[in-house]
Curated annotation (Swiss-Prot):
One of its GO terms (molecular function) is NADH dehydrogenase (ubiquinone) activity. The chain crosses the membrane at residues 3-23, 25-45, 59-79, 111-131, 149-169, 200-220, 242-262, 274-294, 325-345. Pfam families: NADH_dehy_S2_C, Proton_antipo_M. Core subunit of respiratory chain NADH dehydrogenase (Complex I) which is composed of 45 different subunits. Interacts with TMEM242. Keywords: Electron transport, Membrane, Mitochondrion, Mitochondrion inner membrane, NAD, Respiratory chain, Translocase, Transmembrane, Transmembrane helix, Transport, Ubiquinone. Belongs to the complex I subunit 2 family. One of its GO terms (biological process) is mitochondrial respiratory chain complex I assembly. The gene is MT-ND2. This is NADH-ubiquinone oxidoreductase chain 2.
Length: 347
């Protein structure tokens, strides 16, 4: 893709998301979603091979269906309340339809099937945009809709997403699919707290984006797509092997790393709302995800695969890939736990 075209497309993607973020009018929000969806498709098709085209088609069909359900919910709300503003969604049917549409855009269970397939069919850079930036707009609308959302509907979808993420990631060897199931699980954690304390969703989103960006950048730096290729990186990029270990454990929510903060605060908030069984079940479901993160960590950093070469380190040219953003992202993704008291004040 030529740079001027790429700049125009990325500007449209960012403009669509910003329109959703700053609007309180349902029609403008819907237009922002459509701008964002139509502009992201050329980015997904950047490779221009049959697999990327198939992934883009699946993404388009899912997002178009979600947009149709969202518009239907908006029209029902308009007929019931006579207003286009987001703060007036008194009709439970309209609210439920909008919630289902937004969760379909996010990839929550039972509408999660498109996320692993689309992520597997596109490049790592496109997958990074899909699993980070594309989550911001639907979550911002859920944040503003929080008072009118049915908590039972959203909580059931959140718990299903955590279970699906845990079971789905267990037998995966493709790194993109592992990160897709990781995204489904983290979306479940975010939406579980939306109704009870929406600001905690912000914290979880920020932490998730930092950890996912760092992981994708490391995989792009290593040019790794499978667990096997990642396991051979120890003698080419020894430092990145250690960094991947830290990031995987942080994504799994293991203390004392940064990924533990949102899980800790969400479980604490749900317990304050006299919910004991649900956070216990969520913590158990998180163990499934932690298992495949630990397995990936073990194959990457704790085993040494046999080599026919007597040299431990491989000879290679100097890597010219720029990783300017990687050091601060890794620091924030792994070492923010001591700053939890300040986050408690903010959130």
């Amino acid at each position: 893709m030529k740079p001027p075209i790429f700049i125009i497309i990325m500007t449209t993607v960012i403009s669509g998301t910003m329109m959703v973020l700053i609007s309180s009018h349902w029609l403008l929000i819907w237009i922002g979603f459509e701008m964002n969806m139509l502009a992201i498709i050329p980015i997904l098709m950047k490779k221009f091979n049959p697999r990327a085209m198939e992934a883009s088609t699946k993404y388009f069909l899912t997002q178009a269906t979600a947009s149709m359900i969202l518009m239907l919910g908006i029209i029902i709300n308009l007929l019931y309340s006579g207003q286009w503003t987001m703060l007036h969604t008194p009709n439970p049917m309209a609210s439920n339809m909008m919630t289902i549409a937004l969760t379909m855009k996010l990839g929550l269970s039972p509408f999660h099937f498109w996320v692993p397939e689309v992520t597997q069919g596109i490049s790592l850079s496109s997958g990074m945009i899909l699993l980070t930036w594309q989550k911001i707009a639907p979550l911002s609308v859920l944040y503003q809709m929080a008072p009118s959302i049915n908590p039972n509907l959203l909580m059931s979808m959140a718990i299903m997403s955590m279970l699906v993420a845990g079971w789905g990631g267990l037998n995966q060897t493709q790194l993109r699919k592992i990160l897709a199931y990781s995204s489904i699980g983290h979306m479940g954690w975010m939406t579980s707290i939306t109704v009870y304390n929406p600001t905690l969703m912000h914290l979880n989103l920020v932490m998730y984006i930092m950890m996912t960006l760092g992981t994708f950048m490391l995989f792009m730096y290593n040019s790794s797509l499978t667990t096997l290729s990642l396991s051979y990186s120890w003698n080419k990029f020894p430092l990145t092997t250690l960094l991947i270990l830290m990031l995987m454990l942080s994504l799994g929510g293991l203390p004392p790393l940064s990924g533990f903060i949102p899980k800790w605060m969400i479980i604490q908030e749900l317990t304050k709302n006299n919910m004991i069984i649900i956070p216990t079940f969520m913590a158990i479901a998180a163990l499934l995800s932690l298992y495949f993160y630990m397995r990936l960590t073990y194959t990457t950093a704790l085993t040494m695969f046999p080599s026919m070469n007597n040299m431990k380190m491989k000879w290679q040219f100097e890597n010219t890939k720029k990783i300017t953003l990687l050091p601060p992202l890794i620091i924030m993704s792994t070492m923010l736990l001591p700053m939890t008291p300040m986050m408690l004040i903010l959130y």
